[in-house]
Amino acid sequence: IALKRDGETHLLDTEKILYIEAVGGTFVYTEDATYESDLRLYEMEQKLLEQGFFRASKQSILNLKKVKSLKADINRKIRVTLVNGEQILVSRMYADELRRRLGIQ
């Protein structure tokens, strides 16, 4: 996937992506760096859905292969801890689908 960082375009292996966030732009996070994409979040979702990515909220997509643990949070949300220790909150709108995708009751 082509992403921008420091004025350069980088071709990044999607396996390295931890999560993607849309806050005033679309940002892609890896363990080593943050990149920017010209694509909107829904476009990233369409590209990555078949590669193990999951829509966690209106603002974020996470790589299910990088999930270390899950914890129930208030209002039926789920707090996901990634392999690097960062935490992403899965909104209740997407929480049931996350449980289904991971085979959790």
Task: Give the location of each predicted region.
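Short, charged, intrinsically disordered terminal tails
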Residues: 100-105
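Conserved binding/recognition cores within well-folded domains
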Residues: 1-83, 87-89
